[in-house]
């Protein structure tokens, strides 16, 4: 694992399909990819296996509705190391998406979120065993994620997302 420094703010821009079109130097450094390898690659090139598909399903649903989305994310650098971020993703007026990421400042909340993700990954594994396709697994994972968030006392993902915004 390598740490994102408190002063490091980084971004990427993608097209409507999630293919990276722009990235800043901090993103390049943390991901340990060359800029040329990132541009034109799907953003999930940095997806860590500890991230449930349900989290991304929820994100894409929000984005397709024109809403921004915020969440804690575990990313996988090219060298196999992990780096954790708080990501805010928003639709851009002319198409595509902007993802701005920073160091998770609320470590206790981050740890709870990652426990929820762990439970969601287990849930998704069971759904996958039932021969569900990738989209069905992600949709079920998203529903499971929302159930756990409601059990934690939040009425919706939007309420939860607002509560975990870094202050």
Description of each model-found segment:
Residues 94-166:
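Sensory coupling linkers of modular signal transduction proteins
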Residues 1-122:
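Sensory/regulatory domains in signal-transduction proteins
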């Amino acid at each position: 694992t390598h740490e994102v420094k408190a002063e490091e703010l980084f971004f990427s821009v993608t097209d409507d399909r999630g293919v990276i079109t722009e990235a800043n130097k901090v993103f390049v450094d943390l991901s340990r990819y060359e800029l040329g390898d990132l541009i034109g690659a799907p953003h999930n090139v940095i997806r860590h296996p500890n991230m449930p598909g349900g989290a991304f399903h929820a994100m894409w649903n929000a984005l397709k509705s024109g809403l921004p989305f915020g969440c804690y994310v575990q990313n996988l650098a090219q060298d196999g190391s992990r780096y954790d971020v708080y990501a805010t993703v928003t639709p851009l007026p002319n198409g595509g998406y902007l993802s701005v990421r920073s160091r998770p400042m609320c470590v206790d909340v981050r740890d709870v979120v990652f426990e929820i993700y762990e439970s969601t990954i287990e849930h998704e594994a069971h759904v996958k065993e039932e021969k569900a396709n990738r989209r069905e697994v992600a949709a079920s994972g998203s529903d499971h994620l929302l159930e756990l968030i409601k059990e934690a006392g939040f009425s919706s993902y939007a309420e939860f997302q607002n509560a975990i915004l870094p202050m």
